[in-house]
């Protein structure tokens, strides 16, 4: 049952094949077995069981709230959840319990979804590995698949076997791992420069970033207001569309959301792609791109072409400036947003009371990690009076040029862009931490952050590499053409038969490992 899609398990609930409580208990059991992956910061067991019980009562009365009623979900720990700790994986917010739900969380709960818990991330969502949070790194479940372990057996000879585990990508790595291990059927992530698509690509799930303004940001603890978007992680594209249909629409609490009513996101079964024009940005063929990803990218383009679609090379001429532009704008907004964490209103406060200034400084030193403090310093530098015009204003102008590049390509007749999501497959943790967060983020966001600056929708379905690891390929659509984008991604997913089949195989491979780790965890506690 846990291996089914959201739509399938929803039908099973309606037909009485399983009850919401039984489903919730199965997921809770799996959360305990996979605890060593560190996907969850908080497991809301009591809340989940109570919500499942209420859902069960509705089903018995024949009053189901819809496709999400009784469905286990998870939420990244930078969305406010009423009565449940929301930490952003930071000492600054340890112990903070919001008095309200983020709009997207409330919408899911209003549809009867069952909240399993809050998922792990990089501190304040600043990172691309889910390795820099105060609760420790998230392990990629694919590290324990039979195929990967066999392929890397010779490399790990003489090493501690567990030192070879893979990163999940970030910053929504906990959400991606939670979906990949069947502990929930959908999860919320956030996406500022690729934080939903990157871990989705590494963990073998679907990661969807909606158009900016389509989904409310209210209650998402802000990183970069002009780029932040709630992201959706599911096991298949259809499930992402179901969740998007529940979340999309105007929110009076978020002035950036669309004013017009949003139609339901029902995806048609696309059988003929001959009328599609697929664009391949030539600037995305970088020297750093791995041969494995490049090969799969080429095969995907050939697949569309063989089915009659028009596949053309296009140019996004300002691509080479995008990562630098993103860094300036991102850190500038980070500096502004992080200013609210001063130890007075909520969150951590140090014991120093010599002066207000000393208390501020010590609180922020104790509350933020080096990555967050570094981005604050960079942002404040760019916002200095003598630097403002040369950095921040110039970056805003370049951002407009980058957005116009996409507009020009789509106006030329291109329906969807096809690009890699990441430069390579997931790498081992020990290799990942050899470089600093800033360097890694610049590498890992290279194909994803421009979409956030342009406000476009993007989705990352996946294929499987020769090494037995997921590789993400990104589809980018016109602003507010999310349904068309997901329809194309659904067609592609059907052709490559991924990820649901492979995820089931992953769980079959890993089940014995999970049981061993669970027993080891119990014996250590004893």
Curated annotation (Swiss-Prot):
An individual GO BP term: glutaminyl-tRNAGln biosynthesis via transamidation
One Gene Ontology molecular-function label: ATP binding
HAMAP family: GatA (MF_00120)
GO cellular component, one term: glutamyl-tRNA(Gln) amidotransferase complex
Main subcellular localisation: mitochondrion
EC numbers on record: 6.3.5.7
Keyword tags: ATP-binding, Ligase, Mitochondrion, Nucleotide-binding, Protein biosynthesis
Gene field: QRSL1
Lineage: superkingdom: Eukaryota
Subcellular location: Mitochondrion
UniProt cross-references to NCBIfam families, sorted A to Z: gatA
Top EC category: ligase
General function of this protein: Allows the formation of correctly charged Gln-tRNA(Gln) through the transamidation of misacylated Glu-tRNA(Gln) in the mitochondria. The reaction takes place in the presence of glutamine and ATP through an activated gamma-phospho-Glu-tRNA(Gln).
InterPro entries on file: Amidase (IPR000120), Amidase_dom (IPR023631), AS_sf (IPR036928), GatA (IPR004412)
Reaction(s) the record says it catalyses: L-glutamyl-tRNA(Gln) + L-glutamine + ATP + H2O = L-glutaminyl-tRNA(Gln) + L-glutamate + ADP + phosphate + H(+)
Protein name stated in the entry: Glutamyl-tRNA(Gln) amidotransferase subunit A, mitochondrial
PANTHER family with a match to the protein in the record: GLUTAMYL-TRNA(GLN) AMIDOTRANSFERASE SUBUNIT A, MITOCHONDRIAL, TRANSAMIDASE
Family statement drawn from the similarity comment of this UniProt entry: Belongs to the amidase family. GatA subfamily.
Subunit structure: Subunit of the heterotrimeric GatCAB amidotransferase (AdT) complex, composed of A (QRSL1), B (GATB) and C (GATC) subunits.
Active-site residue list: 76, 171, 195
One of the Pfam families matching this protein, by short name: Amidase
């Amino acid at each position: 049952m846990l291996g089914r899609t959201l739509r399938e398990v929803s039908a099973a609930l309606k037909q009485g094949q399983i009850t919401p409580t039984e489903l919730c208990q199965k997921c809770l059991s799996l959360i305990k077995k996979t605890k060593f992956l560190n996907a969850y910061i908080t497991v809301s067991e009591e809340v989940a069981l109570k919500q499942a019980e209420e859902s069960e009562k509705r089903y018995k009365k024949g009053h189901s709230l819809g496709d999400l009623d009784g469905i286990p979900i998870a939420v990244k720990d930078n969305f406010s959840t009423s009565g449940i700790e929301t930490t952003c994986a930071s000492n600054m917010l340890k112990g903070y319990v919001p008095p309200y739900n983020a709009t997207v969380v409330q919408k899911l709960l209003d549809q009867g979804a069952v909240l399993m818990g809050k998922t792990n991330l990089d501190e304040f969502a600043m990172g691309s590995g889910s390795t820099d949070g105060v609760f420790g790194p998230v392990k990629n479940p694919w590290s324990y698949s039979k195929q990967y372990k066999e392929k890397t057996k010779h490399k790990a000879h003489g090493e501690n076997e567990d030192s070879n585990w893979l990163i999940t990508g970030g910053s929504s790595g906990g959400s991606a791992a939670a979906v990949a291990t069947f502990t929930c059927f959908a999860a919320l992530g956030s996406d500022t420069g690729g934080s939903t698509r990157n871990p989705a690509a590494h963990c073998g799930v679907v990661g969807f970033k909606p158009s900016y303004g389509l989904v409310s940001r209210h209650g998402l603890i802000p990183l970069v207001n002009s780029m932040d978007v709630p992201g959706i992680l599911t096991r298949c594209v259809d499930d992402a569309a179901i969740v998007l249909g529940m979340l999309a629409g105007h929110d009076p609490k978020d002035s950036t959301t669309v004013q017009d009513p949003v139609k339901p996101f029902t995806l048609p079964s696309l059988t003929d792609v001959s009328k599609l024009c697929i664009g391949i940005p030539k600037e995305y063929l970088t020297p750093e791109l791995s041969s494995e990803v490049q090969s799969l990218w080429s095969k995907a383009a050939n697949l569309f072409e063989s089915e009659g679609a028009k596949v053309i090379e296009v140019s996004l001429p300002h691509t080479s400036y995008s990562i630098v532009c993103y860094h300036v704008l991102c850190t500038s907004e980070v500096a502004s947003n992080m200013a609210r964490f001063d130890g007075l209103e909520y969150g951590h406060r140090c014991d120093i009371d010599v002066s207000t200034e000393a208390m501020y400084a010590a609180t922020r030193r104790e509350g933020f990690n080096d990555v967050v403090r570094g981005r604050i310093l960079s942002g404040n530098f760019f916002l200095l009076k003598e630097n403002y015009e040369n950095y921040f204003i110039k970056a805003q102008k370049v951002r407009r040029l980058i957005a116009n590049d996409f507009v020009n390509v789509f106006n030329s007749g291109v329906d969807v862009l096809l690009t890699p999501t990441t430069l390579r497959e997931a790498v081992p943790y020990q290799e990942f931490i050899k470089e600093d967060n800033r360097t890694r983020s610049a590498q890992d966001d290279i194909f994803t952050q421009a979409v956030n600056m342009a406000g476009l929708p993007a989705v990352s379905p996946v294929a499987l590499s020769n090494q037995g690891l997921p590789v993400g390929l990104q589809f980018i659509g016109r602003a507010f053409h999310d349904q068309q984008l997901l329809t194309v991604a659904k067609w592609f997913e059907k052709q490559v038969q991924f990820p649901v089949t492979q995820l089931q195989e992953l769980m079959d491979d890993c089940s014995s490992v999970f049981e061993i780790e669970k027993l080891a965890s119990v014996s250590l506690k004893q």
